[in-house]
């Protein structure tokens, strides 16, 4: 996995021009869940390259084919079936238990990136691992009315901002489902708020909202376990 860090850095700083803020918000040790907004297929790699710590990102299982699949496997990324993949969540939990970092794009599909809705996988992971969640705002990877599959030209300016970490836990007398719903709402609110703050700081807006969602993105997965 070590070789993938320079590759991620090169994508952010040689192919594109990525400004990064909030690195000091990322815990320097122990497990961390990075939860980013999702507007482009580049979001996962850009978040990976901007992070001060290496991470394993949940990637749709269909990407693990051929040469790209070998690269993803060798760099430590995690295949996930987004229709519901408890095994992927358990693998992520095991990595967090070992003090590693996991990246997830909990909106689940590419869209406007406002984090108006997220899936339950990130909440399950936070509650069952105890790892802090760092909201990550990713801006510039898609803009205006660019298509969901748009490939930005080299040299475009991106912005990645790491927000304040939040730690979630179960409350006394709270059911598993209630804990999941509350945790998901707290993560969603933190991510949405951080995206708004990053827009004001960087001056880079989100793309226009699309009426149809694409289902071929790096994402988390819903979890019904309590």
Protein language model features and the residues they cover:
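Catalytic core of membrane glycerolipid acyltransferases/transacylases, capturing the structured
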Residues: 13-14, 26-84
């Amino acid at each position: 996995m070590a070789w993938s860090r320079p590759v991620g850095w090169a994508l952010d700083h040689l192919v594109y021009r990525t400004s990064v803020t909030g690195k000091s918000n990322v815990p320097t040790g122990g497990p961390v869940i990075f939860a980013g907004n999702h507007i482009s297929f580049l979001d996962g790699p850009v978040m990976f390259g901007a992070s001060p710590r290496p991470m394993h990102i949940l990637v749709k299982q269909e990407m693990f084919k051929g040469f790209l699949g070998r690269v993803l496997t060798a760099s430590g990324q995690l295949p996930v079936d987004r229709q519901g993949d408890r095994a992927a969540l358990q693998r992520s939990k095991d990595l967090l238990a070992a003090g590693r970092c996991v990246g997830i794009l909990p909106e689940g599909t590419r869209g406007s990136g406002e984090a108006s809705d997220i899936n339950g996988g990130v909440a399950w992971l936070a509650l069952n691992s105890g790892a802090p969640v760092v909201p990550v705002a990713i801006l510039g990877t898609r803009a205006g009315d660019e298509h969901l599959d748009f490939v930005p030209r080299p040299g475009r300016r991106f912005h990645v901002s790491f927000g304040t970490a939040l730690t979630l836990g179960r409350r006394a007398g709270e059911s598993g489902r209630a804990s999941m719903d509350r945790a998901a709402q707290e993560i969603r609110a933190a991510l949405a708020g951080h995206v708004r703050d990053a827009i004001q700081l960087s001056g880079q807006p989100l793309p226009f909202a699309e009426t149809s969602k694409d289902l071929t993105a790096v994402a988390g997965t819903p979890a019904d376990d309590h």
